[in-house]
């Protein structure tokens, strides 16, 4: 290192402590980067890569960005998952001896960003910390630095379960200890796409002990300690806005794994990954940013306590029934600023005068909001606003201190109102009246000298001066004026009186700006005292905002209040898929009932492709989620149990499990449901078994249905194209066949989208292909093949018969029994050549035909119908195996 210049040595010394971050090294008006940082940053930011002499034999790669534009460049890097260490000059270069002292003042990471394009106002920006213990358990702590919110929970289960809970937090960055295995880290980085950071310290930092007063479990404290130590190490500033840690337990909320959340499109759509088109998009009628964040949190964790759900529903009902109360509340909420994030800005010291003005305007709405809610005859409402302080003294303080239209910068003055500070008023009087005095002096000097063109001006070099044209110099009295500057056509002078006033005026203006800055920073410190009250107020207002949002959307979309029951029954009359109905935008939507009494656990759903089976299944799940977050539901009547979990297998393969086939993903998600579901769960399986051969798929589907029916007892919707499975209704007493109806008119299929009792008779797949405008020749060929297949052998479904208690053996049951016609026709040359593919010698027409029994003749007939050109090699092998197996049977 000694071969480098002192400045580069300083850079390398600082960089050594921030190896995993870009180091923005302040040099004058630029942040510079060197060596590998420069090469990588130039590529990522698309800026010029240059070089400089650093004292060694080779020039050092270098790139830089202007300090006033650095924020944008930092955001770009953090958006891509990088960290940025900001190294500032911490002493005046003019007074520095040797190299100017520099220090890292902040480490900006994906999980600690306070503002920027990546921070959605209606989403939290959580930083997660995961701690692994020897007994296999984990503790997960999360912090949103923008709001000060802190949570912690204890997790048990498989690594996959832990990762899914981490994923559910939406964290972009996770803090672990240095002993984490490479396998675990790979899952975090590759599967969850998170930035990894390290922190080994787990003791609660000094000064933050009060935040964990309600946390007694050592494991949870360690996780929180790791989180807090990392935040302190990276932020290097006040954290007065951090809120007490909230403990949550995953068994206190409905469990919806990340696959199911995505399949149901709760907060984002599967296709675009955007909010628009999701359930959150439909339900979000919130008027505040903090209300929007709370709504998303509620949707991530629906309640399972019946009493708490009913409390919310009653408040929503109150708002639905009182239009004027709801509309008045909405108007007031529109004026409420993001109190949570403002508290964070106050604590961090980056709040400006406009922010405080917005705070005052927000607080002006609070007394009326609290009063209106206090008048409600509702215990939940009374408990909600209990302890909420409208902070009227803060409102008054901000009202008499901040100007109505302050500038963005707090260093430009014109922030503080007149009358707030006596000294400031005096300076302003001098500044204002000093300029008036200058104007009066100019008039007086003109009168004394008789020079009408005499004027008093100002510039930064000479200050105030009296300017007289050369033609009028003879009119000046001797000894009164001191020459200051000579111009081509004029002379500039000063007087003792002018110099004295100049000093007063300029000092006053400088002192005004500095004093206003000092007064504002002092005011900011006073506001800090109110942070806990503001945060409590924010929670109250957020909750009211979510409840009015539910009421607003419920009235607009004609939702109904669900009745919660302790029985295991579902009664939904005229249920609708809320998002599909909204997207149809007034077009006719076909509602459907879902009636499953206590003795009915499984709906086996058959019906045409594109008829609405998946929509019907999602509809039930969304109605359930809406009910358990406290919202009305899309139906004319709804009686629902409280479900503990929702499991779904709907749609295409989930990219979270990268590299797996659709069938493997189906099996993994089926396993998850089978292993974890209870009789209080809801299971939605769409076309399980489609990713393998027909027989394998059908066998697996039947086995899964039977297991759910016999062993779990969960309410289940199971859609299938295996119509042969509908005979299970005869052997499974808590299973019912339902189908989505369709009719044929003039050779075309019309989907009625109506759920009816009984099994469907057709899938109408070819009709769907016609709708997709596949070639006519292909459609015609498909119809030929379908006719051939429908004439083939019957499919036998194993029926269970009771032999003794809890012992079941299969007994074949014929689903479709149509005798296969035994053809006596001659085999032509073409057919002979096809048979030779299976090892049979070509026969001459003159030779005698072999004598075949009935079974062999039936197989021969089926072979004749096979078109190998329309089959893949694998399909051909499967067909050969099936026919061979048929021949071997006795």
Swiss-Prot record:
Gene for this chain: mutS
GO biological process: mismatch repair
A GO term from the CC aspect: cytosol
InterPro entries found in the cross-reference section: DNA_mismatch_repair_MutS, DNA_mismatch_repair_MutS-lik_N, DNA_mismatch_repair_MutS/MSH, DNA_mismatch_repair_MutS_C, DNA_mismatch_repair_MutS_clamp, DNA_mismatch_repair_MutS_core, DNA_mismatch_repair_MutS_N, DNA_mismatch_repair_MutS_sf
SMART domains, alphabetized: MUTSac, MUTSd
Protein origin, superkingdom: Bacteria
Family, as annotated: Belongs to the DNA mismatch repair MutS family.
Binding locations of ATP: 607-614
Annotated protein name in UniProt: DNA mismatch repair protein MutS
Listed Pfam families: MutS_I, MutS_II, MutS_III, MutS_IV, MutS_V
Task of the protein: This protein is involved in the repair of mismatches in DNA. It is possible that it carries out the mismatch recognition step. This protein has a weak ATPase activity.
Keywords: ATP-binding, DNA damage, DNA repair, DNA-binding, Nucleotide-binding
GO terms for MF: ATP binding; ATP-dependent DNA damage sensor activity; damaged DNA binding; mismatched DNA binding
PANTHER family for this protein: DNA MISMATCH REPAIR PROTEIN MSH1, MITOCHONDRIAL, DNA MISMATCH REPAIR PROTEIN MUTS FAMILY MEMBER
């Amino acid at each position: 290192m000694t071969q480098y210049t002192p400045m580069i040595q300083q850079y390398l010394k600082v960089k050594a402590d921030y190896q995993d971050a870009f180091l923005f090294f302040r040099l004058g008006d630029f942040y510079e980067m060197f060596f590998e940082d420069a090469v990588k940053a130039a590529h990522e930011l698309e800026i010029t890569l240059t070089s400089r002499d650093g004292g060694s034999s080779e020039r050092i790669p270098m790139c830089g960005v202007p300090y006033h534009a650095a924020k944008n460049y930092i955001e770009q890097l953090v958006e891509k998952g990088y960290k940025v260490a900001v190294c500032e000059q911490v002493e005046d270069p003019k007074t520095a001896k040797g190299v100017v002292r520099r220090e890292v003042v902040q480490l900006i990471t994906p999980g600690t960003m306070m503002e920027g394009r990546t921070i959605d106002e209606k989403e939290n920006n959580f930083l997660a910390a995961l701690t692994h213990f020897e007994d296999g358990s984990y503790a997960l702590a999360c912090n949103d630095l923008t709001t000060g919110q802190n949570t912690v929970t204890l997790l048990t289960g498989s690594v996959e379960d832990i990762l899914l809970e981490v994923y559910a937090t939406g964290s972009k960055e996770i803090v672990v200890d240095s002993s984490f295995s490479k396998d675990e880290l790979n899952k975090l980085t590759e599967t969850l796409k998170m930035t990894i950071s390290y922190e080994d310290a787990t003791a609660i930092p000094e000064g933050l002990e009060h935040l964990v007063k309600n946390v007694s479990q050592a494991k949870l404290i360690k996780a929180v300690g790791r989180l807090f130590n990392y935040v302190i190490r990276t932020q290097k500033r006040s954290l007065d806005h951090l809120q007490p840690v909230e403990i949550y337990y995953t068994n206190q909320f409905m469990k919806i794994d990340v696959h199911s959340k995505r399949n149901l499109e709760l907060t984002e759509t599967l296709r675009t990954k955007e909010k628009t088109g999701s359930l959150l998009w439909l339900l979000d009628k919130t008027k505040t940013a903090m209300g929007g964040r709370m709504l998303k949190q509620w949707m991530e964790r629906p309640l399972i306590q019946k009493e708490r759900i009913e409390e919310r529903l009653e408040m929503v009902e109150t708002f639905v029934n009182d239009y004027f109360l709801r509309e008045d509340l909405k108007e007031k909420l529109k004026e409420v600023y993001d109190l949570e994030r403002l508290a964070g800005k106050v604590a961090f010291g980056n709040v400006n005068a406009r922010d405080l003005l917005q705070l005052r305007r927000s607080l002006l709405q609070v007394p009326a909001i609290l009063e209106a809610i206090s008048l409600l005859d509702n215990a939940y409402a009374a408990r909600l606003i209990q302890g909420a302080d409208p902070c009227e003294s803060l409102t008054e303080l901000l009202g008499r201190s901040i100007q109505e239209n302050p500038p963005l910068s707090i260093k430009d003055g014109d922030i503080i109102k007149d009358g707030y500070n006596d000294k400031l008023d005096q300076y302003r009087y001098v500044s204002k009246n000093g300029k008036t005095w200058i104007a009066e002096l100019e008039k007086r000097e003109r009168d004394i000298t008789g020079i009408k063109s005499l004027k008093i001006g100002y510039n930064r070099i000479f200050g105030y001066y009296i300017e007289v044209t050369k033609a009028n110099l003879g009119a000046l009295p001797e000894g009164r004026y001191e020459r200051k500057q000579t111009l081509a056509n004029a002379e500039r002078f000063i007087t003792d009186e002018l110099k004295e006033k100049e000093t007063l005026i300029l000092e006053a203006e400088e002192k005004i700006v500095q004093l206003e800055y000092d007064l504002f920073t002092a005011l900011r410190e006073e506001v800090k005292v109110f942070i806990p009250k503001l945060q409590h107020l924010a929670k109250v207002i957020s909750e009211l905002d979510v409840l009015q949002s539910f009421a607003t959307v419920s009235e607009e979309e004609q939702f109904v209040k669900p009745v919660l029951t302790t029985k295991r029954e579902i009664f939904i009359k005229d249920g609708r898929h809320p998002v599909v109905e909204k997207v149809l935008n007034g077009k006719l939507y076909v509602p459907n009932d879902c009636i499953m009494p206590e003795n009915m656990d499984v709906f086996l759903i058959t019906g045409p492709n594109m008829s609405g089976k998946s929509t019907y299944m999602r509809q039930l799940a969304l109605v359930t989620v809406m009910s358990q977050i406290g919202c009305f539901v899309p139906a004319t009547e709804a009686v629902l149990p409280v479900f503990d979990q929702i499991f779904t297998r709907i749609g295409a393969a989930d990219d979270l499990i990268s590299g797996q086939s659709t069938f493997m993903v189906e099996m993994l998600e089926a396993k998850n449901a089978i292993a974890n579901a209870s009789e209080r769960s809801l299971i939605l399986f769409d076309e399980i078994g489609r990713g393998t051969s027909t027989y394998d798929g059908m066998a697996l589907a039947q086995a899964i249905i039977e297991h759910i029916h016999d062993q779990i007892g969960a309410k289940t919707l199971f859609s299938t194209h295996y119509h042969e499975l509908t005979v299970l209704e005869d052997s499974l007493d808590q299973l019912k066949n339902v189908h989505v109806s369709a009719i044929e008119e003039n050779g075309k299929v019309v989907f009625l989208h109506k759920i009816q009792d009984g099994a469907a008779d057709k899938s109408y797949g070819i009709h769907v292909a016609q709708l997709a405008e596949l070639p006519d020749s292909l459609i015609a060929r498909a119809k030929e093949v379908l006719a051939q297949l429908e004439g083939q052998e019957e499919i036998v479904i194993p029926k269970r018969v009771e032999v003794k208690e809890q012992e079941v053996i299969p007994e074949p049951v014929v689903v479709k029994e149509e005798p296969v016609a035994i053809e006596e026709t001659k085999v032509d040359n073409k057919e002979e050549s096809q048979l030779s593919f299976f090892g049979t010698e070509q026969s001459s027409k003159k030779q005698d035909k072999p004598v075949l029994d009935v079974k062999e003749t039936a197989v021969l007939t089926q072979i004749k119908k096979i078109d190998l050109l329309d089959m893949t090699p694998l399909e051909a092998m499967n067909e050969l195996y099936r026919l061979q197996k048929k021949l071997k049977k006795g």
